[in-house]
Amino acid sequence: SRGLGDVYKRQEVSFGDLIFGLNIDKPLYSLKSLGWWAELLAPLITKLPVSWFYPMGKQQEKRTVRHTKYFLENDIIAGDFHFIKKFMPDKLPGKIIITNTVTAADREMLRQAGVSILITTTPCLEGRSFGTNVMEALLVALKGSNKALSAEEYLELIEQYHIESSTEYLCAKE
């Protein structure tokens, strides 16, 4: 697979999946441990309502600052923006955020928090970056397909339509 975790597997990294997804104060430091926990918990979690683990609707706007130390001790914070926004402290000076589904208002909030760089994994269109699933659906529609495409087909269309990530310098690093 070519997920965000694979990008960081050779770096010093802490995965916050248990911390922010399940409120279990246990950072994971390798893809192997992430895989082990996923194998253990996925059979149970997939039978429960998504809303128990993921902010839906108005819950996406509700902030609950939690586990601040993990935000502050990492230079790069990567993941789902709904989780980042929900749990982040008010100040993240000099941090780099890698995410998507960011609006213009979210960018301003990150600027006010002191975030130095925002990288979205999908392009910014009309002031917001969309989720990867939205971009995948767009590519499937552009291809005229009624099913998911192969990795090669996605890459071909990404090149054809010049779809790129976005990097914004929000604040000078303190």
Language model: regions and residue ranges:
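Gly/Ser/Thr-rich loops at beta-strand to alpha-helix junctions
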Residues: S1-R2, I19-L22, F81-K85, N100-A105, ...
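Short, small-residue-biased leader/transition segments that mark boundaries at the very start
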Residues: G3-Y8
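General beta-strand structural signal in soluble alpha/beta enzymes
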Residues: V13-D17, A78-G79, T99, L118-T120
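Conserved catalytic alpha/beta core of Sir2/sirtuin-type deacylases, generalized to analogous enzyme cores
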Residues: V13-P27
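Active-site rim loops that border cofactor/substrate pockets in soluble metabolic enzymes
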Residues: N23-I76, H82, L92
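Conserved acidic residues
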Residues: D75, K95, S116
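Short, T/G/N/S-enriched strand-turn elements that build extracellular solenoid repeat scaffolds
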Residues: F87-K91
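C-terminal functional extensions of proteins
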Residues: I98-E174
